[in-house]
Amino acid sequence: MLFRSILNRQNEARANWISGVSHDIRTPLSMIMGYAGRIAESKAASKSIREQAEIVRKQSVKIKELVQDLNLVSQLEYEMQPLHKEMVRLSKLLRSYVADLLNTGISDSYNIGIKITPDAENAVLECDARLISRAVNNLVQNSMKHNPQGCEVCLSLTASQNHLILAVTDNGMGLPAEKLQELEEKPHYMESTDERLDLRHGLGLLIVQQVAIAHNGTFKLTNVFPKGCEATLIFPYIG
């Protein structure tokens, strides 16, 4: 009991430290983004200066997203992220996500589809809808990012007596066999330099894993024949 108490305090201290650093970075970063944005749109600045300012602005946005992701991973891992659970019809959530994605005007190189089996159509899961959507978005964006030549991405939802299975499948280049083995051996580890697994700064996969765990679910990646990758979130469910 004493060891667990000490470990919990250490985990809480780590999470609070990351949260504090994230908060401290937010204000100066917002100022950098604001100034860079104004310069990028200034008619008084030369074309070269405007282009450089736009690069600074875009990279600042990436840093902001990285900080937010790092904070979210920490909060989820140490069970400090409040879960706003409600009864959510996942078929409706997925359709809404796909509609929003298509309305953003994605490239014609990507074909986004959705497949929901009759037994899952009215299935309701007690979950944090925002986090589930975030996990799905990370996986869809990863399929698109790592298949620049284009691919088909299918979101599917099926139900069994005990589980709801949410899958994101693409027909892209898939995962090297050695990387799949690494994931099985080290499910919470990912090299940020890995080109295929770098889901948004190397934290996206961890976010998906932690979202699954927070909902008493599991997450796995597999290759599909003849090519492509399938990411599966499995949640306990009583039909």
Task: Place the predicted regions along the sequence by residue.
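Short alpha-helical segment of the dimerization/phosphotransfer core of two-component systems
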Residues: 58-63
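Conserved micro-motifs of the catalytic ATP-binding
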Residues: 78-83, 124-127
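Short conserved segment of the HATPase_c
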Residues: 175-191
